[in-house]
Amino acid sequence: LLNVNLTGGEPFARKEIVDIAKLYIDNTTIQSIYVTTNASLPDRIANFAEVITDYDKKIDLTFQISIDDFPKEHNKVRKVENLFENCIETYRKLKSMNDRVTPVVSVTVTHENCDNMKNIFKYLTEDCKIDSLKCTIVRDEGVFKTPQEKREKIFNAYCWLTDKIKEYSKIKKLRNYNLKSIQGKLHSKKDEISWDLTKKMYLNPKYISPCHAGSLFGIITAAGLVYPCEILENKLLGNLRENNMNFMKIWDSTVTKEAKNFILKSKCNCTYECA
C-alpha cells in the first residue's frame, strides 16, 4: 500500500482523523496521504498537516480543496456560510508549510458552472492567486441526473479547463503536486490519463481499457466495509471488523478474486476520476 485517500463526507469532521492517519503510517507501507476536503475547518486541517509531517518525516500530504464557483455561488450551492473564504484560508495556510504539504484546488465541472468556467478559472488563478488546480467532471449518481441539454456544454467546459491546466502546468504557472517525489509524479500522470479517458467516454459511455478496481485500489467505508470502488455497491468484499481489521485477508480472498473477475469479464467502465 503506497497511498491512502481520506475522503467523505467531510473527513475533518472526524476529530480523530490524526489518529486514523497515524494508524495507516504505523501499520502499512504508505508513502503519501491524499485528503479530499471542503475546507470548512481551516485550523483543524492545518493542525493535521503540522502533526503528521512532524510524526513522519517521509510522508507526503496532498489536500484536495473543493471550489466550484465564485464565492457567493459556491457558498450558496454548498449551503455553508463563508465556505469559499475558508477554502482560500486553508489553501494559504497549507501553502506556507514545507514542500511535503501540497494543497490543490479541485473544480468539478457541472451544469451550474460550465457556462462561466473561463471566468471562474481566471478568478481563482489571478484574483485568488491559486497556483495548484485540477478538475473533474460531474458524474450521474443516485437521484442526480445531468440535464441532457447541458451535457455537451459541460463536456466543452471540461475540455477547455483540462487543456488550460496542462498549458499552465507546462509553463509552471500551476504546480499541482510535489514532482520531486515518486507519488507526486504518479498523481500528476494519473490526472492526465484520467482526463483523456474521460473525454473519450463522457458523451458516449463505453469500455476503453480494463478497470483495476479491486487490485490497484479499493475503498473502505466509515463502517469498515471494503469495496472495489464506490460505484459497485453490490460487490461487498468484506468487513474489516469481522476480519480482525486484516485488510489483506479480505484483499486476497476468493470474494475479491470473483469481483475482479466480474469487473474484467463484464468490461465494467465509468468516469471514476477520484481513484
Describe the role of every protein-language-model region.
Residues 1, 190-191, 247:
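N-terminal pre-core extensions flanking Radical SAM catalytic domains
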Residues 1-61, 153-157:
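Conserved alpha-helical substructure of the radical SAM core
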Residues 10, 37-41, 67-69, 107-109, ...:
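Short, flexible loop/turn elements at secondary-structure junctions
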Residues 15, 81, 85, 253:
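Conserved phosphate-coordination/catalytic loops
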Residues 55-213, 217-222, 227, 231-239:
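Radical SAM enzyme [4Fe-4S]-AdoMet core and its adjacent flexible, acidic
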Residues 206-208, 223-275:
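Flexible mid-to-C-terminal extensions adjoining Fe-S/redox cofactors in radical SAM and related proteins
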